[in-house]
Amino acid sequence: QRQMCIRDREYVEAGRDMAESEIAAKFLQDAGYDMLNCDNGTYDAWYWAHPPVYMPENCNLAEVEHIKKFVDIPVVCAGRMTLDAAAEAIAAGRLDGAGFARNFLADPEWFTKVLEDREDDIRPCILCHNGCFNMCHYKGVPNDQDLSDSLHLARCAVNAEMMQWDKHYIKKTNDPKTVHIVGGGIGGMEAARVLTLRGHKPIIYEKSGVLGGTFIAASSESYKGKLRDLLTWYRREMEKLGVEVRLNTEVK
């Protein structure tokens, strides 16, 4: 954490440094902790513990590996961890475990698909915080909330069913219809996906030559690879489900 720098005043660092964290880790171990789940974040720098798309992959790994040297209990790292980096660090003994959470919000079958070598089928988390943070009703301390309210902390922008199963769920129809969808962006493709799973026949009309809509431009920055992964996933879903897509077709 850094204090605000005001013009003509000396700039100073504030917050816990690594030396203090080394002592704190040993103190917690001596106090009886069974495991340490570590990251660089604080309440004032939450984005280290819950990295958005702007943060690099494995952004906490080096510091957590360092902390492990000072304790004998298991040490776990989370925060935009990749499976390869986690597996390599654990195999080398520099880490005892890795934490993954948002992956399961976006796709509850995430790790099952990894084990079955079906990674192309995984609906990716796009690290947007629009569901798991912005849609929640968090008031500061979960214990001060009704359980029914705090449950909303686990929503997901790319998975409408997550923690809203009584509201958003896919049920087979007894009255199949042909549904014409104007626009092949993310919304159009999601509508087509759900309609197909329900037993309807959607037809997408897209005036350009490619599916994606404005999400193509929105995902164009170099650091937004996860957004491009979501586009790839949706396009693949359209092919897998056999959705009829009419490109270069404008509906007036």
Locate the predicted segments by residue.
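Short, intrinsically disordered, charge-balanced linker/junction segments flanking boundaries
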Residues: 1-6, 245, 249-252
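Short gly/ser/thr-rich secondary-structure transition/capping motifs
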Residues: 161-166, 243-249
